[in-house]
Amino acid sequence: WLIVDHYAIDERWHKELRPYCQKIMVIDDLADRKHDCDLLLDQTFGRNSDDYQSFVPEYCQVLCGAEYALLRPEFAEWRAYSLKRRENGQLNHLLINLGGVDKDNITTQILRELSYISLPNSCRITVVMGVTAPWVKQVEEQAEQMPWLTEVKVGVNNMAELMANSDLAVGAAGATSWERCCLG
């Protein structure tokens, strides 16, 4: 299997590689271009296979909807703990993660806006960014100006644990949405 997950790739690229692999799987959530694949996965809530009818070959199996969300096992492992934590309803720890890159520097904007709202003095904020994020320095500078303890973590490998130990998570609308849903 060749698994393709890239917005700039379409059937032209798939056809070029078809001779070198037995099967091609595409992960997509746009339903806006043709694919030459044997299996297509779209985890978008409410999406159905009819949305891809004119974009994939007849033989392609299309898996659509939240029931096909790809989650690492660690999220299932942290689920019970995370749901139990939610019972107290207090806001002591805020997690912010706008994906691995956050190319538009939304994280800094969120931190700035948070500084104008009322949060408990004991509240702490954890910001998670990817190693390729171009705005890490600006986010770190903004974090230092926050009225609450604010930590910036880069390139973490324990995202499920960080989410499970937060009371509220602010994040992008990608695959991490399903991770946040899993952990409550």
Task: Spell out what each predicted region is.
Residues 18, 144, 181:
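Anion (oxyanion) recognition and catalysis
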Residues 21-27, 73-80, 150-154:
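Short gly/ser/thr-rich secondary-structure transition/capping motifs
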Residues 36-105, 136-137:
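A nucleotide-sugar donor-handling region in carbohydrate enzymes
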Residues 80-82, 88-166:
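Donor-nucleotide binding loops and adjacent catalytic segments primarily
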Residues 160, 177-183:
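Short alpha-helical segment that forms part of, or immediately flanks, the ligand-binding pocket
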Residues 164-175:
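Acidic donor-binding loop of glycosyltransferase active sites
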